[in-house]
Amino acid sequence: MSQSKPLVFAMVAGELSGDILGAGLVKALKARHPDARFVGIGGPRMEALGFESLFAMEELAVMGIVEVLSRLPRLLKVRSSLVSQLLALKPDCFIGIDAPDFNIGVELKLKQQGIKTVHYVSPSVWAWRPKRIFKIAKATNMVLSLLPFEKAFYDQHQVPCTFVGHTLADDIPLELSKADARETLGLDRDAEYLAILPGSRGGELKMLSEPFIKAAVAIKEALPDVRFITPLVNEKRREQFLTALETHAPGLEIQLFDGQSREIMAASDGILLASGTATLEAMLVKRPMVVAYRVAPLTYSIASRMMLIKRYSLPNLLSGKDLVPELIQADCTPQKIASEVVAMMNRDNRALIAEFTEMHQNLRQNASERAADAVDVLIGANAPHGRSSNEVG
């Protein structure tokens, strides 16, 4: 169809991983629709591409049931204001990127007013609260899933879903040089490094900094030559981690970096990290890992009763096997973490890396382009270079 005015795409990304996905999609849609406007809530990567943020992304980056409750009045105010502004703007499509507890409510209100809605990143309906799929069906015209097993779940319930793969799998080479990463970061070419990634959100660092730092002390005793490297997403998180380091192990040396998490992972011999998207990135970088996580006790008590899965990290979920150790909640102790990390650093991990490589190949689908294809088809926009917008995939 011919556009009489530039397209408007509204998007909301709730945290760092959503900003990465959003930036890829903005770039792909911009290539097709150079005059399009992109507006909503995004992070620095999206904003660097000309995205207009109506609120700071940090407002949405909260975790856990208890933590969300304390911020609920502000979150509801942000959502209400955002919906009002978007209804006035009447975008051609709204794309909620992850953050389902925030975005699905937005999608529902917009869809009821005739605006096309897409949810990019399936909520973990296969893991817990499966009945959410009915609300998702009511709120969205299309779900874009990153993982192959998710589409089958949606197909069972006749909810429109497109498997697009994961942008991280597209962006990260099948082989990433450890030596090159060390040179980039100015690290010793021959030393042994453990990357420590306690998360990107304030709530994660609050829960994980202490056990990770205390574990590092024990790891250093068992492996005296090991060195620690930690990327932190911004100055707030750096200050938060430094405070924890001074409190729990003032004499421990950990080299801190601003961002550069992928380079840090690639430079390492092994990784200790919080559960979440970072576990996928660690898998794609092909480094062995130990995954640990804990939340507020009440949050865990409520959530664990609703869980349908026994595995939490993406390498284990994708493989259907216990490929990497997971230390969740009561198991997330300095002693258990240190024990698993020392074992990981001492073992031959070649078979594990081969499994990671196979999973990487399966997730490589040119995700941003496939997502942009699906959005174009949904809104009936012309595909670029004379290609029919029906030729998706």
Curated annotation (Swiss-Prot):
Chemical reaction(s) catalysed: a lipid X + a UDP-2-N,3-O-bis[(3R)-3-hydroxyacyl]-alpha-D-glucosamine = a lipid A disaccharide + UDP + H(+)
Record-listed E.C. numbers: 2.4.1.182
Family: Belongs to the LpxB family.
Keyword rRNA processing belongs to the record: no
Gene Ontology cellular component terms for the protein in this record: membrane
Keywords: Glycosyltransferase, Lipid A biosynthesis, Lipid biosynthesis, Lipid metabolism, Transferase
Gene designation: lpxB
Pathway involvement of the protein, from the record: Bacterial outer membrane biogenesis; LPS lipid A biosynthesis
Enzyme class, spelled out: transferase
Organism: Shewanella amazonensis (strain ATCC BAA-1098 / SB2B)
Protein name: Lipid-A-disaccharide synthase
Top-level lineage group: Bacteria
Purpose of the protein: Condensation of UDP-2,3-diacylglucosamine and 2,3-diacylglucosamine-1-phosphate to form lipid A disaccharide, a precursor of lipid A, a phosphorylated glycolipid that anchors the lipopolysaccharide to the outer membrane of the cell.
CDD domains: Glycosyltransferase_GTB-type
GO molecular function, one term: lipid-A-disaccharide synthase activity
Membrane-traversing stretches: none
A biological process from GO: lipid A biosynthetic process
InterPro entries (alphabetical): Glyco_trans_19 (IPR003835)
